[in-house]
């Protein structure tokens, strides 16, 4: 698939190639990493990027994502950060109006008749574009695994390429956008390119009372999915006022990489603030693409409820191992109350 600039004008297109949303849980290569809070499965791309600013789509460097970008002159910009705060474009505060009100008569596509969807943003005289490039080598801990890129926040619409290949498109500014880079990534000399447009059809929805910025304003990172991976995690604790007992209700979605592999194992442990495991359960992982494991257990002893006077926290640890007993991934969540 090729990128299409007209996606900016079409409210029916707000993501292309974007992975499904999931829980925001940290992943680690083993239990020791989880204890230290440093993961070998994650690589930050924050820092200095190559950058070119254009006032609209017509004047942007169209082939900037290619290694031989022609005559494009790149400057340096720091990521994360808004483009306006780096000296480009203008800072603009809006309360109740759209940022173009009083200048351009613009309404959402398809609301005023056929044909009015075309060109509202892609052909606008003023709709700034930021063209970002980042060169990187893949960290050792991510090699040989499925590699995902996570943009924590990009305002407002972005196109992504890796090594000259189109990867995807997304519009949601304030939630993470993830894409699978595995088919195109190399161990060394990767070229990541991101084209950010200030406005798209998402501007009709993201119309809150705040300053209007654009750019890669939150962190960007790569993370690896090992043989067994916690894809999604839902956990909810319950507290019984009558008897002081606590119950943990959890659903854990596990994905498996590769077909025909031997079964693995998942260990779940709920610990108190002293590290004592109060609840432990193990389950066999089958070699299917995805499986969701459910857990609902009541602790045998009374729990300490959280309060503003005693902010007591419990820790949920999930450890995945392969058929040889080697840890492939560890997840540690320390905010259960």
Residue ranges and their predicted role:
Residues 162, 246-284, 293:
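Beta-strand-rich binding/interaction modules
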Residues 142-145, 185-189, 299-313:
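Short glycine/proline/serine/threonine-rich loop/turn segments at secondary-structure transition edges
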Residues 129, 187, 245, 286-291:
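Solvent-exposed, conformationally flexible loop/turn segments
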Residues 331, 335-337:
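Residue-level detector of conserved catalytic or cofactor/ligand-binding positions
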Residues 3-15, 19-21, 27, 35-36, ...:
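Accessory beta-strand-rich segments of carbohydrate-active enzymes
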Residues 227-256:
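Surface beta-strand/loop "capping" patches
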Residues 177-183, 290-298:
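Exposed aromatic-hydrophobic patches
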